[in-house]
């Protein structure tokens, strides 16, 4: 018996604040395949010359994306974003881990959001 989709799309979110690692686990649905739009965001503020920030996104234990960049916009914030889509077969969870680094920059916010479409 096939289970109907919920009346509202699933939304999952983790806000790690100024933490350096965020983990979002979307639990499995035993009956249906789901599709998610996923956004990962790091916000930093430069503390001095040579400031840099980096973000690595791992999905189910494998590298999905990584980037390092100079931190710009002195006196304000700078950010790094990664957006991707993932099909989640019935019975399978999805684990997203975002790891960050900051040199001469302060982490302000680390966020992962997933919305079913």
Q: Can you annotate each of these PLM segments?
A:
Residues 1-23:
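Transition segment at domain starts
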Residues 15-30, 76-84:
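Short beta-strands within extracellular/lumenal beta-sheet-rich domains
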Residues 27, 39-45:
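Short edge beta-strand/loop segments characteristic of extracellular beta-sandwich folds
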Residues 31-34, 46-51, 104:
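A short beta-turn/strand-edge loop motif at beta-sheet boundaries
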Residues 33-38, 85-109:
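Noncatalytic modules at the cell exterior or secretory-pathway interfaces
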Residues 42-44, 98-100, 114:
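Short beta-strand segments enriched in hydrophobic/aromatic residues
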Residues 43-83:
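Terminal beta-strand-rich extracellular "head" domains
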Residues 111-117:
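Short beta-strand-to-coil "C-cap" segments at the C-terminal boundary of structured domains/repeats
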């Amino acid at each position: 018996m096939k289970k109907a989709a919920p009346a509202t799309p699933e939304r999952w979110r983790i806000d790690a604040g100024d933490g350096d690692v965020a983990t979002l686990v979307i639990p499995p649905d035993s009956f249906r395949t789901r599709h998610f739009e996923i956004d990962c965001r790091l916000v930093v503020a430069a503390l001095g010359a040579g400031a840099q920030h980096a973000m690595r996104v791992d999905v189910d234990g494998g590298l999905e994306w990584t980037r390092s960049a100079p931190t710009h916009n002195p006196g304000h914030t700078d950010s790094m974003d990664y957006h991707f889509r993932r099909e989640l077969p019935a019975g399978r969870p999805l684990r997203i881990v975002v790891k960050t680094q900051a040199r001469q920059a302060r982490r302000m916010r680390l966020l992962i959001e997933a919305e079913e479409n």
